[in-house]
């Protein structure tokens, strides 16, 4: 028995066969393919498209933000376009019949709207600060927080489409762009390689020790240098005024120090021995010829004045030596006094043997030195005496109207700043000799030896 033939089914099969036969030509003609449309558009210049019904006509495309309503009816006529409705857009020139729908930022993907949708631009979605876009497909992405790189350092900071690149510290390994402790590493070969102790860590303690020791060594060196300087200043006190003048640019005030074993005081009539031409005269003590000692007896009245005018007549006194009982007779040839003649001493020799102090109570002595030194050589004279340049200029400005008073102030300042055993006429004489001013030295000597000066001035010893 055969299957019954249904007339309706047979008709359907015949129609299907006819459609398959005409598909390559008829269907293609009814619905033009995309390639054919592009070929026809290429026949027109840029910014225009071919009329869908008449290829010889090129119509102007619609601007972005608009869509095509009707094609141009003939060459030279404009295409009819309208602006896209709200929620739709076209981002470029087109001849589409309908605008595209705007996309919406997906909150479930933690997206945020960067800029809203406009007629000529689609909605722009992005991520919040400290987040990056992790794409799940070509168009869909999810916002993920950037890695803070705990237990590591940031190699590359977080960007819009890239997470932070971290470099983990020793004892941690990178897992999912996070630094995980090596204690969580079990049997992962990659993990075990990353958790090996680096060789460079062995030298780190040495580097840190050097960083600590270097400042300590510098500090101890400075302390040692300071201690040495203090010790030298204590060992050599004469350096203190010079160091003071170098640091402060001024002369240090020097206290008047009496020389060891030397007491200088003004001469008085009671303390000045008298002089006599008698060769047997004893200026200090008179001794009897008996073996026993007797009280000293003055033989002549004492001269009331002793000044530079008497220096050329100065003769050392002669003493009588009386042997004591039981003394060796070889030491004493005669009991009679034997005078010892002495040569006449020069003024310079007397000054060198007995340095004379420049006394401020006697301004005439200072003025004698001021008037004896040429003004053109005065600054050189004071520099050689040891007065600082700053002090010289200060006193010169202070007494600018009177040059003589300025020179007197400089000499007085030198006398006050110089120790007592150094501020002597001997020092002044040596400086003048070094300056080849022996004539000036003689003038000063004559001034000090003059009767007018001797009658009012007593040089201290």
Swiss-Prot record:
<dbReference type="GO" id="GO:0006952">
    <property type="term" value="P:defense response"/>
</dbReference>
<dbReference type="GO" id="GO:0003176">
    <property type="term" value="P:aortic valve development"/>
</dbReference>
<feature type="disulfide bond">
    <location>
        <begin position="182"/>
        <end position="195"/>
    </location>
</feature>
<dbReference type="InterPro" id="IPR011029">
    <property type="entry name" value="DEATH-like_dom_sf"/>
</dbReference>
<feature type="repeat" description="TNFR-Cys 1">
    <location>
        <begin position="43"/>
        <end position="82"/>
    </location>
</feature>
<keyword id="KW-0812">Transmembrane</keyword>
<dbReference type="GO" id="GO:0003332">
    <property type="term" value="P:negative regulation of extracellular matrix constituent secretion"/>
</dbReference>
<feature type="disulfide bond">
    <location>
        <begin position="105"/>
        <end position="125"/>
    </location>
</feature>
<dbReference type="InterPro" id="IPR020419">
    <property type="entry name" value="TNFR_1A"/>
</dbReference>
<keyword id="KW-1015">Disulfide bond</keyword>
<feature type="signal peptide">
    <location>
        <begin position="1"/>
        <end position="29"/>
    </location>
</feature>
<dbReference type="GO" id="GO:0045766">
    <property type="term" value="P:positive regulation of angiogenesis"/>
</dbReference>
<dbReference type="GO" id="GO:0010614">
    <property type="term" value="P:negative regulation of cardiac muscle hypertrophy"/>
</dbReference>
<protein>
    <recommendedName>
        <fullName>Tumor necrosis factor receptor superfamily member 1A</fullName>
    </recommendedName>
</protein>
<dbReference type="GO" id="GO:0043066">
    <property type="term" value="P:negative regulation of apoptotic process"/>
</dbReference>
<dbReference type="InterPro" id="IPR000488">
    <property type="entry name" value="Death_dom"/>
</dbReference>
<dbReference type="GO" id="GO:0005031">
    <property type="term" value="F:tumor necrosis factor receptor activity"/>
</dbReference>
<dbReference type="GO" id="GO:0043120">
    <property type="term" value="F:tumor necrosis factor binding"/>
</dbReference>
<dbReference type="GO" id="GO:0033209">
    <property type="term" value="P:tumor necrosis factor-mediated signaling pathway"/>
</dbReference>
<feature type="disulfide bond">
    <location>
        <begin position="44"/>
        <end position="58"/>
    </location>
</feature>
<feature type="repeat" description="TNFR-Cys 4">
    <location>
        <begin position="167"/>
        <end position="196"/>
    </location>
</feature>
<feature type="disulfide bond">
    <location>
        <begin position="127"/>
        <end position="143"/>
    </location>
</feature>
<dbReference type="GO" id="GO:0030424">
    <property type="term" value="C:axon"/>
</dbReference>
<feature type="transmembrane region" description="Helical">
    <location>
        <begin position="212"/>
        <end position="234"/>
    </location>
</feature>
<dbReference type="GO" id="GO:0072659">
    <property type="term" value="P:protein localization to plasma membrane"/>
</dbReference>
<dbReference type="GO" id="GO:0032760">
    <property type="term" value="P:positive regulation of tumor necrosis factor production"/>
</dbReference>
<dbReference type="GO" id="GO:0010628">
    <property type="term" value="P:positive regulation of gene expression"/>
</dbReference>
<dbReference type="GO" id="GO:0038023">
    <property type="term" value="F:signaling receptor activity"/>
</dbReference>
<dbReference type="GO" id="GO:1900119">
    <property type="term" value="P:positive regulation of execution phase of apoptosis"/>
</dbReference>
<comment type="function">
    <text>Receptor for TNFSF2/TNF-alpha and homotrimeric TNFSF1/lymphotoxin-alpha. The adapter molecule FADD recruits caspase-8 to the activated receptor. The resulting death-inducing signaling complex (DISC) performs caspase-8 proteolytic activation which initiates the subsequent cascade of caspases (aspartate-specific cysteine proteases) mediating apoptosis.</text>
</comment>
<dbReference type="GO" id="GO:0044877">
    <property type="term" value="F:protein-containing complex binding"/>
</dbReference>
<feature type="domain" description="Death">
    <location>
        <begin position="363"/>
        <end position="448"/>
    </location>
</feature>
<dbReference type="GO" id="GO:0045944">
    <property type="term" value="P:positive regulation of transcription by RNA polymerase II"/>
</dbReference>
<feature type="topological domain" description="Cytoplasmic">
    <location>
        <begin position="235"/>
        <end position="461"/>
    </location>
</feature>
<dbReference type="GO" id="GO:0001666">
    <property type="term" value="P:response to hypoxia"/>
</dbReference>
<dbReference type="GO" id="GO:0032496">
    <property type="term" value="P:response to lipopolysaccharide"/>
</dbReference>
<dbReference type="GO" id="GO:1905038">
    <property type="term" value="P:regulation of membrane lipid metabolic process"/>
</dbReference>
<dbReference type="GO" id="GO:0005615">
    <property type="term" value="C:extracellular space"/>
</dbReference>
<dbReference type="GO" id="GO:0007259">
    <property type="term" value="P:cell surface receptor signaling pathway via JAK-STAT"/>
</dbReference>
<keyword id="KW-0325">Glycoprotein</keyword>
<feature type="topological domain" description="Extracellular">
    <location>
        <begin position="30"/>
        <end position="211"/>
    </location>
</feature>
<keyword id="KW-1133">Transmembrane helix</keyword>
């Amino acid at each position: 028995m055969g299957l019954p033939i249904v007339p309706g089914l047979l008709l359907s099969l015949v129609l299907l066969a006819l459609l398959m036969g005409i598909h390559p030509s008829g269907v293609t003609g009814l619905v033009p393919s995309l390639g054919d449309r592009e070929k026809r558009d290429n026949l027109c210049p840029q910014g225009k498209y071919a009329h869908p019904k008449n290829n010889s006509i090129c119509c102007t495309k619609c601007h972005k933000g608009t869509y095509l309503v009707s094609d141009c009816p003939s060459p030279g006529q404009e295409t009819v376009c309208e602006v896209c409705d709200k929620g739709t857009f076209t981002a470029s020139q087109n001849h589409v019949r309908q605008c595209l729908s705007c996309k919406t930022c997906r909150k479930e993907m933690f997206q945020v709207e960067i800029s809203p949708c406009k007629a000529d631009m689609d909605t722009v979605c992005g991520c919040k600060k400290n987040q990056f876009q992790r794409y799940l497909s070509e168009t869909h992405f999810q916002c993920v927080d950037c890695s803070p790189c705990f237990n590591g350092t940031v190699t590359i900071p977080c960007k819009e489409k890239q997470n932070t690149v971290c470099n983990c510290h020793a004892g941690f390994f990178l897992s999912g762009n996070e630094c995980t402790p090596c204690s969580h590493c079990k049997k992962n070969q990659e993990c075990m390689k990353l958790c090996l102790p680096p060789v460079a860590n062995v030298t780190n303690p040495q580097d840190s020790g050097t960083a600590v020791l270097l400042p300590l060594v510098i500090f101890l060196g400075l302390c040692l240098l300071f201690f040495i300087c203090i010790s030298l200043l204590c060992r050599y006190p004469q350096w203190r005024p010079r160091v003071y003048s170098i640091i402060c640019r001024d002369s240090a005030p020097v206290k008047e120090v009496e020389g060891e074993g030397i007491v200088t005081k003004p001469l008085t009539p009671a303390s000045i021995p008298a002089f006599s031409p008698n060769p047997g005269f004893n200026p200090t003590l008179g001794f009897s010829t008996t073996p026993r000692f007797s009280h000293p007896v003055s033989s002549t009245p004492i001269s009331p004045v002793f000044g530079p005018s008497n220096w050329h007549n100065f003769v050392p006194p002669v003493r009588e030596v009386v042997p004591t009982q039981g003394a060796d007779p070889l030491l004493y040839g005669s009991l009679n006094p034997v005078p010892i003649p002495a040569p006449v001493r020069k003024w310079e020799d007397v000054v060198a043997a007995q340095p004379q102090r420049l006394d401020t109570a006697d301004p005439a002595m200072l003025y004698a030195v001021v008037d004896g030194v040429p003004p053109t050589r005065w600054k050189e004279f004071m520099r050689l005496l040891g007065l600082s340049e700053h002090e010289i200029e200060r006193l010169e400005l202070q007494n600018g109207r009177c040059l003589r008073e300025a020179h007197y102030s400089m000499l007085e300042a030198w006398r006050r700043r110089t120790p007592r055993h150094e501020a002597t006429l001997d020092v002044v004489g040596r400086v003048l000799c070094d300056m080849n001013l022996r004539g000036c030295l003689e003038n000063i000597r004559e001034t000090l030896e003059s009767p007018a000066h001797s009658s009012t001035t007593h040089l201290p010893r």
